[in-house]
From Swiss-Prot:
Pfam families: HisG (PF01634). It comes from Cyanothece sp. (strain PCC 7425 / ATCC 29141). It comes from the Bacteria. Pathway: Amino-acid biosynthesis; L-histidine biosynthesis; L-histidine from 5-phospho-alpha-D-ribose 1-diphosphate: step 1/9. PROSITE patterns: ATP_P_PHORIBOSYLTR. GO terms for cellular component: cytoplasm. NCBIfam families: hisG. Lacks the C-terminal regulatory region which is replaced by HisZ. CDD domains: PBP2_HisGs. This is ATP phosphoribosyltransferase. Belongs to the ATP phosphoribosyltransferase family. Short subfamily. Catalyzes the condensation of ATP and 5-phosphoribose 1-diphosphate to form N'-(5'-phosphoribosyl)-ATP (PR-ATP). Has a crucial role in the pathway because the rate of histidine biosynthesis seems to be controlled primarily by regulation of HisG enzymatic activity. Heteromultimer composed of HisG and HisZ subunits. InterPro entries: ATP_PRibTrfase_cat (IPR013820), ATP_PRibTrfase_CS (IPR018198), ATP_PRibTrfase_HisG (IPR001348), ATP_PRibTrfase_HisG_short (IPR024893).
Length: 215
């Protein structure tokens, strides 16, 4: 049976809507009373796993799921061995460097050498500043990253920005964008090559949906 890894959180609703559009209904995950982490589609030919966003590529890489939906930001940070198939064009956001609005910094290169930068995207942040030849200390933080500059623990943060509202409400401002991120369809490489569980069919259906003109 085809297994799909779906991400908890912001991408879940659109991910379920996408699979519904090709005849695979996993909407039970949206029921507030639901406690199941594994749901079989009514058609009986596919099941979905509900997992943390960061775990989606792990399930796909190890073959417990043949397909998955995950943000490009996670793929950049984790660099998993998966097949990158389609840009699904939802869940749009960006990974940015931000500092306190009152700070004197106007671009990333204004940061003093050996500044502290708080982020849960440790590898992306480190690679970005290494590319700029600016030595910084990347401090791993996995919640309320905005508190880094506010408490003086870090001069800057590297974090996902969608509307920018959270930054603004916390007195922070974007300096630069590392990259844009959207939801991506990924697959287990060997399963994709061998077309296990008829994997190519849902992929082609999703591709056709993305190519069709918006009414």
């Amino acid at each position: 049976m085809l297994t799909v890894a779906l991400p908890k959180g912001a991408l879940l609703k659109e991910s379920i809507r996408l699979f519904q559009a090709i005849g695979l209904d996993f909407s039970g995950f949206l029921d507030p009373a639901n406690r199941q982490l594994q749901i079989v589609a009514p058609t009986g030919n596919a099941q979905a796993l509900l997992v943390r966003t960061q775990d989606v590529p792990v399930y796909v890489e190890y073959g417990q799921a043949q397909l998955g939906i995950v943000g490009y930001d996670v793929l950049r940070e984790k660099n998993p061995q998966v097949a990158h198939l389609l840009d699904l064009q939802f869940g749009r956001c960006r990974l940015s460097v931000a500092v306190k609005q009152a700070s004197p910094y106007r671009c990333s290169l204004d940061l003093p050498p050996h500044s502290r930068v708080a982020s849960k995207f440790v590898h992306c942040a480190r690679a970005y500043f290494e590319q700029m030849d600016l030595p910084v200390e990347v401090v791993p933080l996995y919640g309320s990253v905005e508190l880094g500059p506010l408490t003086g623990m870090s001069e800057a943060i590297v974090d996902l920005v969608s509307t920018g509202r959270t930054l603004k409400e916390n007195g922070l401002v974007e300096l630069e964008v590392l990259f844009e991120s959207t939801a991506r369809l990924i697959a287990h490489p060997l399963s994709y090559r061998l077309n296990r569980f008829g994997l190519h069919q849902p992929i082609e259906q999703i591709q056709a949906l993305l190519s069709s003109p918006v009414p």
